Amino acid sequence: MSLKDRYLNLELKLINKLQELPYVHQFIHDRISGRITLFLIVVGTLAFFNELYITIEMSLLQKNTSEELERGRIDESLKLHRMLVSDEYHGKEYKDEKSGIVIEEFEDRDKFFAKPVFVSELDVECNVIVDGKELLSTPLKFHVEFSPEDYENEKRPEFGTTLRVLRLRLYHYFKDCEIYRDIIKNEGGEGARKFTISNGVKIYNHKDELLPLNIDDVQLCFLKIDTGNTIKCEFIL
């Protein structure tokens, strides 16, 4: 039996099996419709396993990046992280001289999947520190959301908001609180003069590591902060 005859015999058996399946049988009326149905099932199955493979690969690459950042130190070296400085992790645009069309060249798939995901929202529990002591028995809780306007001017906007934006946002949230006004009123304005963005807002990541001012230009996803985390902040007066 030739290879062609073997294939046709196998195809016929598969089509006959499909005719016995619930729902599928209504699409098979003859040999041609059977072939079309069989083709769509085979292609769909291949596409499913391909997507499954890509999803697993993506998860593993992101997990490796997350574990690397979790093990790393919180210092100025993060400004030189390879994903921030290397163009291999980012797409490029150039203009074709002949056609005048702007062409976008994307990064490799493994580089794209390895990048950390930007932080879109988080909760911050904040306490007020006066003379080294916590003033509030129940911390203030702010829900912070970030929009594209917060990071559209960054060199790498796909990594989201920087620590500076979060620090500034919390500073203004607290200054708008009635608690702040009451404290300042009781202290005769002395606390207002001492409370600044640089000296008065201490932010910690989800591992309770202090995030210093010298990394304010680093985006949150590199600082052991993920979307949905609850982190801590201290307002020093």
Curated annotation (Swiss-Prot):
The chain crosses the membrane at residues 36-56. Present with 2950 molecules/cell in log phase SD medium. Part of the third module of ergosterol biosynthesis pathway that includes the late steps of the pathway. ERG29 regulates the activity of the iron-containing C4-methylsterol oxidase ERG25. The third module or late pathway involves the ergosterol synthesis itself through consecutive reactions that mainly occur in the endoplasmic reticulum (ER) membrane. Firstly, the squalene synthase ERG9 catalyzes the condensation of 2 farnesyl pyrophosphate moieties to form squalene, which is the precursor of all steroids. One of its GO terms (cellular component) is endoplasmic reticulum. It is a single-pass membrane protein. This is Ergosterol biosynthesis protein 29. Disruption phenotype: Causes lethality under aerobic growth conditions. Affects the methyl sterol oxidase reaction performed by the C4-methylsterol monooxygenase ERG25 and leads to an increase in intermediate sterols and a corresponding decrease in zymosterol and ergosterol production. Impairs Fe-S cluster synthesis via increased degradation of YFH1. Leads to increased mitochondrial oxidants. Leads to an increased accumulation of iron from the culture media. It comes from the Eukaryota. The keyword Disulfide bond does not apply. One of its GO terms (biological process) is ergosterol biosynthetic process. Disulfide bonds: none annotated. Keywords: Endoplasmic reticulum, Lipid biosynthesis, Lipid metabolism, Membrane, Steroid biosynthesis, Steroid metabolism, Sterol biosynthesis, Sterol metabolism, Transmembrane, Transmembrane helix. The gene is ERG29. It comes from Saccharomyces cerevisiae (strain ATCC 204508 / S288c). It is found in: Endoplasmic reticulum membrane.
